[in-house]
Curated annotation (Swiss-Prot):
Factors inducing expression: Expression in the liver oscillates in a circadian manner.
Organism: Mus musculus (Mouse)
A single Gene Ontology CC term: cell projection
Pathways per UniProt: Protein modification; protein glycosylation
Protein name (record): UDP-N-acetylglucosamine--peptide N-acetylglucosaminyltransferase 110 kDa subunit
Length: 1046
C-alpha cells in the first residue's frame, strides 16, 4: 500500500513549524509501520488539517483506512490525492487495492496498469498487479508482472520467491526451483525460500533433498511454523516416523491449537501402531476444529483398526454430514459395508466417491474388487486399469488386477501384474502370495513354495499364504514338521470359521487334512454362500418350475453341467452316458462351461447328447441360468463342485427344480441350493449323512463309472511272451494287446493256451474256481523279434502282415489313440523293461498324484516292502520334484533307493495299459485313486484299499465292492499291510486274485455304462416323482435294482 509522506508540499512557514510538521509526519509513518493505526490516523488528521492538499498525507490516510477495512474512506483519500496530482501512481495503486478487496478485479487491474504507465519502475504496482491477476485467474500475466518487477530490481528476493510460488502452482517446477535458488543466492538466510525449495523437491520425489531444505529453513528460523509442518509431512511420507513426530511436536509448541498438525501427528501415531495414542490425538484435533471431516475420517480408520467398527462407522457418517462429498469417508465407509456383506451399499458408496473424485485410484481399485467378487470381471478390469492410470505405482491395484485376469484365464497377464506389483513394492506380501498361486496353478511348485515363503517372511500372520504353502508341500511330499503344520492349519481354519471368515483351505483340499467333518462341511458352505452373494446382486426373481412333464412330451429333461467336456478324467469316465439314456423317457442337455478343446471326447458328447450348449459363450451367470430354465430342465446335474472351471452361481440361481451333485467332485457342496448328492452305500454310509448338506441318493452298486470298455477295448484281451519264465508263466512281464490280437495269434505257430484259475466271485477267493484262457507265445524267432524291437527302441515292426508297435511310441504312431480318443489299430507291446521294472520281483504300484501320499501311507508301504523282500514300489513323477522327497523319507524308513521306482506321467492309453505290468496296486487311504483306481482295475491289477471317513477316501472300496473283490478292502492299517503282503508272498493266491479282477471287470457292473445309465435313470425318476408329489428333497437310500430300461 503506497503510504509515503515524503516530498511534502513547499511551505513558507517558519523553520520551527516546518520541523514540527516533518516530525509529526515521521511519527505517523512509524506508527503505521508498527500497526498502530489508530495513533497513525490521529496524527495524520492533524497533518491533513494543516495541509489538506499534501498528497503524501492523503496517501498515508488512504493506506491507514485500507488496513482498517474502511474501504470507502481509503478510496476517498486516494481520490483526493489524484485530484491534487493526476500523475500520482501510488494513489492509483491504492485505489486498485480497494477495488481488488471489493472483488472488482478488472477495475483493480486497470488502476494498477495505469499506475505502472505513470511510473514504469513502480515495484509495488507490479506486485499488486500480480496479486490481482492471480485472483482473476491470469497466471501468465501475473508471472510477467513479477518478472517486470525483478527486471527493475533483481535483488528483490521476496518477490523472486513469490514468483517461484506462482511457477510451482503452474507446475513449472524447474523454473520455480531456479527462482528459489536465486532468492537464496541473494539472501542466504531467507528461510522462506529454503522451505519453498523443499516443497519443490518433495513434489519432484526428491524426498531427502526436501528434508534437507526444510531442516535448513527451521535452522534459519526456529519459529517457522509452516516449515516445521512441511518437514513433518515429508518425514511422515518417508516413514521416518520418530523425526516426523518431533517436527509436529515442535510445530505444536509454536501453535498449540493447530488442529491440522494434531491430525497429522495422529496419522503418524497410527502408522506406528500406536492406535490408542492416535485416537486420542485425532479427538484433540476434532475438539480444536469440530468441523474437521479429515480428522473424523482418520479417527474412524483408527477405531476400525482397533475393532470398534460401529464407532468407526459413526465417525465416517459424521465426516459425511460435515462434507457429503468427502471422498475418503465414502470409500472407507464402503469398505465397512463390504465387510459387513452389504455389497450393494458398498458399490453405491464407491461409485459416489468416484463421482466426487473421478481420479480416486483407491476407490477405483476397491470398486473393481467388489465387481470381481460379483463376477463382473470386465467392469472390474476397467476400474483396475483406471486406478493404475491414475497411480502408476499402485501396487495393490496391479496385484488385484492380476487376480481378475487369473479368473479370466489370462495367466500371462496375471503373472505380469503380480511381477509389476512386486517391482513397485518388493515387501508386498499379498503380491508374492498371488504370484505363488500362479506358479502353483502352472505346476511350478518349487517357485510357488519360494514365493509363499517370501510372503510369510514379510507377513507372518498370513493364513492364505500358509495354507497354500501347506498344500504345495503336500504336492511334493515335503513332510518337514508335518504334524506341527497340520495342527496349525487346523487352528487357522477353526479361527476363521469362528470369526465367520472365508477359510483359507479350499473345499477340494479339505480332505487332505485332519479336519473334522463339521469343518469340512463348513468350508464348503462358506464357498456356497459366496456364490449366493454373487447372484444376489442380480436381483433375479425366483424361477417358476413345472410339476409335471407335459411341456416335454412326458420326457424327463436332465441337464449335465461341466467344464470338463473334453480331454479330462471326468469325460473319460462318463462320455458315453449322455448317448445311452432312453430317448423315449429322457431328453439330455449337456451344458459346457469351457470352450471346445477340439478333442474327440468333446465331439462324442456333442454328437450323442440331445442338446449341447456352450455356456462359456454366455459369461453372464444370470443369462446362462435363463438359458437353462428356458430349456425346461427338470434335473440339473453339477459335475464340477468346487473344481477348476466351476460356475456354481448357475445352481445358486436354481434354474431347475431338482439339482444334484454327481461324479466330478469328491465331497459335499455345503450349499443350500444343491438338493442331492448321487453316491452309494459304501461311499456315503447313511450313518454319516450329517457330513453332507445334500440328501443322499444311492446308486445300487457304485456311483462311480468308467468308459474304459469303450475307450480301451483292446485291453479286454491280452497275450504274453514266455520270457525267462523258468517254468512259471507270468501274465505281466511282456504283454501284447490289440483289437486284432486273436487274428494275430492265429497267424503264429506254437501259441499255447494256459488256463489261469481264478475265483468265481464272492467273498472267499477259494470258494469256487473257473479258468481263464491266456495265450502264451513261446520264445521263438517271432518272440525274439518283438523283444529286439523293444530293446532297440524301434517304433514298430511288421509280423505276418500285422503291425506290432512299441508301447512307448503310441504318441508317434497315433496321437489320438495315445490320448484315448481313438482305439489303437496295432498290436501294442508293453514290457517291464520299458519302465526299468525288475522281471523277477513283485511290483506294487500307485499311479496317483503324490499329494495323496502322507507319512503314514508311506510307512505302511515301507512295512509291506520290508515284509516282501523281492518287491518294489512303482510310483509316478507326479510331480517330478516329489521324487527326491519320497526317496529320502523311504531311506529314513530303512528302504534302499532301488526299492522305489519312478516313471514319468504318460498319455492316457499308455497310462492305463502299463498298469498291467504291476502285480498289485496299493491305494492311498488319505484320498483314493478315483479315476486312477478305475484305470488300474481295467488293466486287471488288484487294488488294496482302506476306506476312511471322507467320501474321497471310500471311493476305491465302492469300486471294489461293485467288482466283487471285498477281500481287497482292509478295515485297519495292519489288515491293509497283511493283504498286500499275502498277495506279494503267496503267488498262487496272487494269481487267483489277478484272474478274478481280470474276469470281474468284464462281468461286473463296474464298467457297464449301459447298466449304469439305466440305474441312474431310475434314480432320476425317483427324484422327480418325489418332487412332483410336492415333497421336499429326502434321502433316497433304497434304490431299486434295474431290470429293464427306466
Amino acid at each position: 500500500m503506497a503510504s509515503s509522506v515524503g516530498n511534502v508540499a513547499d511551505s513558507t512557514e517558519p523553520t520551527k513549524r516546518m520541523l514540527s510538521f516533518q516530525g509529526l509526519a515521521e511519527l505517523a509513518h512509524r506508527e503505521y509501520q508498527a500497526g498502530d493505526f489508530e495513533a497513525a490516523e490521529r496524527h495524520c488528521m492533524q497533518l491533513w488539517r494543516q495541509e489538506p492538499d499534501n498528497t503524501g498525507v492523503l496517501l498515508l490516510l488512504s493506506s491507514i483506512h485500507f488496513q482498517c477495512r474502511r474501504l470507502d474512506r481509503s478510496a476517498h483519500f486516494s481520490t483526493l490525492a489524484i485530484k491534487q496530482n493526476p500523475l500520482l501512481a501510488e494513489a492509483y495503486s491504492n485505489l486498485g487495492n480497494v477495488y481488488k478487496e471489493r472483488g472488482q478485479l478488472q477495475e483493480a487491474i486497470e488502476h494498477y496498469r495505469h499506475a505502472l504507465r505513470l511510473k514504469p519502475d513502480f515495484i509495488d504496482g507490479y506486485i499488486n498487479l500480480a496479486a490481482a491477476l492471480v485472483a482473476a485467474g491470469d497466471m501468465e500475466g501475473a508471472v510477467q508482472a513479477y518478472v517486470s518487477a525483478l527486471q527493475y530490481n533483481p535483488d528483490l528476493y521476496c518477490v523472486r520467491s513469490d514468483l517461484g510460488n506462482l511457477l510451482k502452482a503452474l507446475g513449472r517446477l524447474e523454473e520455480a526451483k531456479a527462482c528459489y535458488l536465486k532468492a537464496i543466492e541473494t539472501q542466504p538466510n531467507f528461510a522462506v525460500a529454503w522451505s519453498n525449495l523443499g516443497c519443490v523437491f518433495n513434489a519432484q520425489g526428491e524426498i531427502w533433498l526436501a528434508i534437507h531444505h526444510f531442516e535448513k529453513a527451521v535452522t534459519l528460523d526456529p519459529n517457522f511454523l509452516d516449515a516445521y509442518i512441511n518437514l513433518g509431512n515429508v518425514l511422515k511420507e518417508a516413514r521416518i516416523f520418530d523425526r516426523a513426530v518431533a517436527a509436529y511436536l515442535r510445530a505444536l509448541s509454536l501453535s498449540p491449537n493447530h488442529a491440522v498438525v494434531h491430525g497429522n501427528l495422529a496419522c503418524v501415531y497410527y502408522e506406528q501402531g500406536l492406535i490408542d495414542l492416535a485416537i486420542d490425538t485425532y479427538r484433540r484435533a476434532i475438539e480444536l476444529q469440530p468441523h474437521f471431516p479429515d480428522a473424523y475420517c482418520n479417527l474412524a480408520n483408527a477405531l476400525k483398526e482397533k475393532g470398534s467398527v460401529a464407532e468407526a462407522e459413526d465417525c465416517y457418517n459424521t465426516a459425511l454430514r460435515l462434507c457429503p462429498t468427502h471422498a475418503d469417508s465414502l470409500n472407507n465407509l464402503a469398505n465397512i459395508k463390504r465387510e459387513q456383506g452389504n455389497i450393494e451399499e458398498a458399490v453405491r458408496l464407491y461409485r459416489k466417491a468416484l463421482e466426487v473424485f473421478p481420479e480416486f485410484a483407491a476407490a477405483h481399485s476397491n470398486l473393481a474388487s467388489v465387481l470381481q467378487q460379483q463376477g463382473k470381471l470386465q467392469e472390474a478390469l476397467m476400474h483396475y486399469k483406471e486406478a493404475i492410470r491414475i497411480s502408476p505405482t499402485f501396487a495393490d491395484a496391479y496385484s488385484n488386477m492380476g487376480n481378475t485376469l487369473k479368473e479370466m484365464q489370462d495367466v500371462q497377464g496375471a503373472l505380469q501384474c503380480y511381477t509389476r506389483a512386486i517391482q513397485i513394492n518388493p515387501a508386498f506380501a499379498d503380491a508374492h502370495s498371488n504370484l505363488a498361486s500362479i506358479h502353483k496353478d502352472s505346476g511350478n511348485i518349487p517357485e510357488a513354495i519360494a514365493s509363499y515363503r517370501t510372503a510369510l517372511k514379510l507377513k507372518p500372520d498370513f493364513p492364505d499364504a500358509y495354507c497354500n504353502l501347506a498344500h504345495c508341500l503336500q504336492i511334493v511330499c515335503d513332510w518337514t514338521d508335518y504334524d506341527e503344520r497340520m495342527k496349525k492349519l487346523v487352528s487357522i481354519v477353526a479361527e476363521q470359521l469362528e470369526k465367520n471368515r472365508l477359510p483359507s483351505v479350499h473345499p477340494h483340499h479339505s480332505m487332505l487334512y485332519p479336519l473334522s467333518h463339521g469343518f469340512r462341511k463348513a468350508i464348503a458352505e462358506r464357498h456356497g454362500n459366496l456364490c449366493l452373494d454373487k447372484i444376489n446382486v442380480l436381483h433375479k426373481p425366483p424361477y417358476e418350475h413345472p410339476k409335471d412333464l407335459k411341456l416335454s412330451d412326458g420326457r424327463l429333461r436332465v441337464g449335465y453341467v461341466s467344464s470338463d467336456f473334453g480331454n479330462h478324467p471326468t469325460s473319460h469316465l462318463m462320455q458315453s452316458i449322455p448317448g445311452m439314456h432312453n430317448p423315449d423317457k429322457f431328453e439330455v442337455f449337456c451344458y459346457a462351461l469351457s470352450p471346445d478343446d477340439g478333442t474327440n471326447f468333446r465331439v462324442k458328447v456333442m454328437a450323442e447328447a440331445n442338446h449341447f450348449i456352450d455356456l462359456s459363450q454366455i459369461p453372464c451367470n444370470g443369462k446362462a441360468a435363463d438359458r437353462i430354465h428356458q430349456d425346461g430342465i427338470h434335473i440339473l446335474v453339477n459335475m464340477n463342485g468346487y473344481t477348476k472351471g466351476a460356475r456354481n452361481e448357475l445352481f445358486a440361481l436354481r434354474p431347475a427344480p431338482i439339482q444334484a451333485m454327481w461324479l466330478g467332485y469328491p465331497g459335499t457342496s455345503g450349499a443350500l441350493f444343491m438338493d442331492y448328492i448321487i453316491t452309494d452305500q459304501e461311499t456315503s454310509p447313511a450313518e454319516v449323512a450329517e457330513q453332507y448338506s445334500e440328501k443322499l441318493a444311492y446308486m445300487p452298486h457304485t456311483f462311480f463309472i468308467g468308459d474304459h470298455a469303450n475307450m480301451f477295448p483292446h485291453l479286454k484281451k491280452k497275450a504274453v511272451i514266455d520270457f525267462k519264465s523258468n517254468g512259471h508263466i507270468y501274465d505281466n512281464r511282456i504283454v501284447l494287446n490289440g483289437i486284432d490280437l486273436k487274428a494275430f495269434l492265429d497267424s503264429l505257430p506254437d501259441v499255447k493256451i494256459v488256463k489261469m484259475k481264478c475265483p468265481d466271485g464272492g467273498d472267499n477267493p477259494d470258494s469256487s474256481n473257473t479258468a481263464l484262457n491266456m495265450p502264451v507265445i513261446p520264445m521263438n524267432t517271432i518272440a525274439e523279434a518283438v523283444i529286439e524291437m523293444i530293446n532297440r527302441g524301434q517304433i514298430q515292426i511288421t509280423i505276418n502282415g500285422f503291425s506290432i508297435s512299441n508301447g512307448l511310441a503310441t504318441t508317434q504312431i497315433n496321437n489320438k489313440a495315445a490320448t484315448g480318443e481313438e482305439v489303437p489299430r496295432t498290436i501294442i507291446v508293453t514290457t517291464r523293461s520299458q519302465y526299468g521294472l525288475p522281471e523277477d520281483a513283485i511290483v506294487y504300484c500307485n499311479f496317483n498324484q503324490l499329494y495323496k501320499i502322507d507319512p503314514s501311507t508311506l510307512q505302511m508301504w515301507a512295512n509291506i516292502l520290508k515284509r516282501v523282500p523281492n518287491s518294489v514300489l512303482w510310483l509316478l513323477r507326479f510331480p517330478a520334484v516329489g521324487e527326491p522327497n519320497i526317496q529320502q523319507y523311504a531311506q529314513n524308513m530303512g528302504l534302499p533307493q532301488n526299492r522305489i521306482i519312478f516313471s514319468p506321467v504318460a498319455p492316457k492309453e499308455e497310462h492305463v495299459r502299463r498298469g498291467q505290468l504291476a502285480d498289485v496296486c496299493l491305494d492311498t487311504p488319505l484320498c483314493n485313486g478315483h479315476t486312477t483306481g478305475m484305470d488300474v482295475l481295467w488293466a486287471g491289477t488288484p487294488m488294496v484299499t482302506m476306506p476312511g471317513e471322507t467320501l474321497a477316501s471310500r471311493v476305491a472300496a465302492s469300486q471294489l465292492t461293485c467288482l466283487g473283490c471285498l477281500e481287497l478292502i482292509a478295515k485297519s492299517r495292519q489288515e491293509y499291510e497283511d493283504i498286500a503282503v499275502k498277495l506279494g508272498t503267496d503267488l498262487e493266491y496272487l494269481k487267483k486274485i489277478r484272474g478274478k479282477v481280470w474276469k470281474q471287470r468284464i462281468s461286473s457292473p463296474l464298467f457297464n455304462t449301459k447298466q449304469y445309465t439305466m440305474e441312474l435313470e431310475r434314480l432320476y425318476l425317483q427324484m422327480w416323482e418325489h418332487y412332483a408329489a410336492g415333497n421336499k428333497p429326502d434321502h433316497m437310500i433304497k434304490p431299486v435294482e434295474v431290470t429293464e430300461s427306466a
